[in-house]
Structure formats: structure tokens, C-alpha cells
A protein has these predicted regions:
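Membrane-helix boundary elements
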Residues: 2-41
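Alpha-helical transmembrane segments of integral membrane proteins
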Residues: 3-10, 14, 42-45, 69-73, ...
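Core segments of alpha-helical transmembrane spans in multipass integral membrane proteins
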Residues: 18-19, 40-62, 77-81
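Membrane-helix boundary connector in multi-pass membrane proteins
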Residues: 62, 66, 83-101, 118-120
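Membrane-water interface at the C-terminal end of transmembrane alpha helices
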Residues: 107-121
């Protein structure tokens, strides 16, 4: 399980940093043509900065495996909130089912790999 967990951290780290940097540099790539304006690009850049931070936290968990518990649970809470936002939008008929399903994958991976028991000292 340790190898799988470290793979999850590495994947989240690479995706978070890479996609976050892309959103910082080219936020209009995430928008439909004509939807880019000052507010939408600003919000996407902020989300990109958050993605970089989350990716760096995943890398920290990868490199500090024995001490990762509080950071892992913080990532788990974030993933739960992010997933709930998308499920709410789906239930209000504002999104297709693909959106909440895709946004539940990180939550499930973090839940499966969570260090529920503290490591012995």
C-alpha cells in the first residue's frame, strides 16, 4: 500500500503543479471562446495558484511519508469540499454527471490512502 500511496502523491503533485502553472500562464485555455474576461481569468489564475499549492503539499507528503498524516487529512478535507460543490451543482441540474464523478476521484484516492492509524513511534 505504501507504493500505491506514494504513486498517488506523485501523480497529484505533478498534475497539481503542471496544471496550476498552466492556469496561471494561460487561463483562457480552460474557457470557451468568448468567455474570457478580467474576472474569469483572475479566478482561474487563483485556482491555478491553489493547484500549485496542492501539488506541492502532495510532494511534501511523498517526501515526508512518516509525518504526512495532518497534511493528508487537510488534502482530504479539501477534496471532500471540492467534490461536494460539484455534486451539489449536479443535483441542481447545473452540471452533467461527469463533473462530480471526475471530481470525486481525488477524494476516493485520498480516502483509500489515508493514514487512519498513527504510525508507531
Amino acid at each position: 500500500m505504501r507504493g500505491f500511496t506514494r504513486t498517488v502523491y506523485a501523480l497529484f503533485g505533478v498534475l497539481g503543479v503542471a496544471l496550476g502553472l498552466l492556469a496561471l500562464v494561460k487561463p483562457e485555455l480552460a474557457l470557451r471562446p468568448g468567455d474570457a474576461n478580467g474576472l474569469t481569468t483572475h479566478l482561474l489564475r487563483e485556482e491555478g495558484a491553489l493547484g500549485v499549492f496542492l501539488g506541492l503539499m502532495a510532494f511534501w507528503c511523498f517526501t515526508h511519508f512518516e509525518e504526512r498524516r495532518p497534511v493528508h487529512f487537510a488534502l482530504l478535507v479539501f477534496a471532500a469540499l471540492f467534490s461536494l460543490i460539484h455534486w451539489r451543482e449536479y443535483l441542481l441540474d447545473n452540471r452533467s454527471i461527469g463533473s462530480p464523478l471526475a471530481n470525486s476521484v481525488p477524494l476516493l484516492l485520498l480516502a483509500v490512502t489515508a493514514p487512519y492509524k498513527p504510525l508507531p513511534r
